[in-house]
């Protein structure tokens, strides 16, 4: 029996073995007898005692409509490093049901709670055991998880000069993600990451400590060390591993955005490459890439949320047309416009860049007005707006992105495009159900060479 007549959300969460977020949602829905004092929910203990009679978390969730109403035969997924849930939405469009999300960023958590108030949401993956995660997801003993997906950050492997290798694996969220996934042993594991994962060393040696007359790089300092390490762990658990660097434009996304997708299968058989739905010039009989014009022209009569360019930058944008960048300025203005950056190496194609109408968008970044990665509207004197980001990333119109303006840009700029997630989900379901997966020999999945498991490891993976 609970001693106090009124208890807090935290106390109720502990008694019910639910997350505080879940308890607050139940308060809002009237599933628990509670009232608000200011911004704080106060809960009648008698209501909690009734809930405590329910034997399991799963039963409690069902009793109070805390589970989504999708059919129970959908394959089940758990999501980590969920962000704004771009990967999740694509996977769900393929036919999966996401039971749990994990995110530490406050704005992204608010986005998840706003759109999926009934979904289990946890914070830092390192704060939970496998048992905690399964319980919060409502997975009862004997029930399988079909898919675990996420994009763990790989920076932890190679923080310049300050990391201790992998002596403290508990502090590494990438390692924790693998530990959780391999402990749960779903049918499939998906790892999404940036291109840098393919070349990231286990330990970074500063550039001023390399070169002629200095000791050669150790094995853990060699490019690709992180990838080799990940694959070794996954394969030792009996999973197959296949991966490639995929340009999202090849999957119906109006954006040139390349991401590494690693797919691991518990049955040990290699999952083929994703099946493209589009190609740059219509190769393989596929439709051509979707352009920016096709994507954002219907957004003209809405209110756009966007950051502003500095006035001194607008001076140059007034001289540039769609698809142009700093090199299209008169020669006498190029040095003036770029300042010290003019003398840097590389093409500097992100400086003073107006995106083109009849191409997919360049990769959306977390801030469209940073000098080296400008994303200016093709015609207007402004960066691309949050609303334009959202449709380029293919989020549904009803999907709410929470937070301040820069929070929204960050969430959308970090998201996996829905079309790429859909391609991943379809491939996994086809493999799971024994359906033939069409191959596209010599298809150019990205702008780079030697980016797949077959390129790097041959048939051994």
Curated annotation (Swiss-Prot):
Keywords per UniProt: DNA-binding, Methyltransferase, Restriction system, S-adenosyl-L-methionine, Transferase
Keyword S-adenosyl-L-methionine among UniProt keywords: yes
Active site: 154
Enzyme class per UniProt: transferase
Domain SAM-dependent MTase C5-type: 75-435
A GO term, aspect molecular function: DNA binding
BP GO terms, sorted: DNA restriction-modification system; methylation; negative regulation of gene expression via chromosomal CpG island methylation
Matching InterPro entries: C5-Methyltransferase (IPR050390), C5_DNA_meth_AS (IPR018117), C5_MeTfrase (IPR001525), C5_meth_CS (IPR031303), HTH_17 (IPR041657), SAM-dependent_MTases_sf (IPR029063), SinI_DNA-bd (IPR010093)
A Pfam family of this chain: HTH_17
EC number(s) given by UniProt: 2.1.1.37
Catalytic activity entry: a 2'-deoxycytidine in DNA + S-adenosyl-L-methionine = a 5-methyl-2'-deoxycytidine in DNA + S-adenosyl-L-homocysteine + H(+)
Alphabetized PANTHER family for the sequence: CYTOSINE-SPECIFIC METHYLTRANSFERASE, DNA (CYTOSINE-5)-METHYLTRANSFERASE 1
Family per record: Belongs to the class I-like SAM-binding methyltransferase superfamily. C5-methyltransferase family.
Protein name: Type II methyltransferase M.SinI
Organism, as annotated: Salmonella infantis
Gene that this polypeptide is encoded by: sinIM
């Amino acid at each position: 029996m609970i001693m106090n007549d009124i208890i807090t959300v935290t106390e109720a969460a502990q008694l019910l073995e639910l997350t505080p977020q879940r308890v607050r949602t139940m308060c809002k829905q009237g599933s628990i007898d509670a009232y608000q004092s200011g911004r704080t929910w106060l809960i009648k203990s008698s209501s909690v005692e009734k809930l405590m009679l329910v034997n399991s978390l799963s039963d409690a969730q069902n009793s109070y409509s805390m589970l989504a109403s999708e059919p129970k035969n959908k394959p089940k997924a758990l999501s980590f490093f969920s962000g704004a849930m771009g990967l999740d939405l694509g996977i769900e469009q393929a036919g999966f049901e996401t039971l749990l999300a994990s995110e530490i960023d406050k704005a992204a958590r608010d986005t998840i709670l706003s759109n999926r108030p009934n979904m289990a949401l946890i914070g830092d993956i390192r704060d939970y055991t496998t048992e905690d995660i399964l319980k919060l997801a409502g997975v009862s003993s004997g029930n399988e998880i079909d898919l675990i997906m996420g994009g763990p950050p790989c920076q932890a492997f190679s923080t310049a000069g300050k990391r201790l290798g992998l002596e403290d694996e508990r502090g590494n969220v990438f390692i924790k993600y693998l530990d959780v996934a391999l402990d749960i042993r779903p049918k499939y594991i998906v790892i999404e990451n940036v291109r840098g994962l393919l070349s990231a060393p286990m330990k970074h040696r500063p550039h001023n400590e390399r070169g002629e007359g200095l000791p050669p790089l150790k094995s853990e300092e060699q490019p690709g060390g992180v990838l080799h390490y990940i694959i070794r762990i996954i394969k030792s658990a009996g999973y197959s591993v296949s991966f490639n660097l995929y340009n999202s434009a090849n999957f119906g996304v109006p954006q040139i955005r390349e991401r590494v997708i690693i797919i691991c299968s518990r049955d040990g058989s290699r999952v083929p490459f994703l099946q493209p739905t589009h190609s740059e010039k219509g190769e393989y009989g596929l439709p051509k890439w979707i352009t920016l014009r096709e994507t954002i022209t219907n957004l003209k009569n809405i209110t756009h949320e966007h950051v502003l360019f500095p006035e001194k930058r607008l001076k140059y944008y007034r001289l540039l047309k769609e698809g142009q960048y700093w090199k299209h300025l008169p020669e006498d203005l190029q040095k003036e416009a770029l300042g010290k950056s003019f003398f840097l190496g590389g093409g500097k194609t992100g400086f003073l860049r107006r995106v083109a109408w009849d191409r997919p968008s360049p990769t959306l970044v977390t801030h469209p007005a940073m000098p080296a990665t400008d994303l200016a509207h093709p015609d207007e004197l402004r960066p691309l707006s949050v609303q334009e980001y959202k449709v380029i990333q293919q989020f549904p119109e009803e999907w709410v992105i929470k937070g301040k303006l820069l929070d929204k840009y960050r969430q959308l700029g970090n998201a996996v495009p829905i079309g790429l997630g859909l391609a991943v989900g379809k491939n996994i379901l086809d493999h799971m159900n024994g359906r033939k997966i069409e191959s596209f020999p010599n298809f150019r999945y990205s702008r780079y060479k030697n980016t797949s498991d077959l390129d790097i490891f041959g048939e051994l993976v």
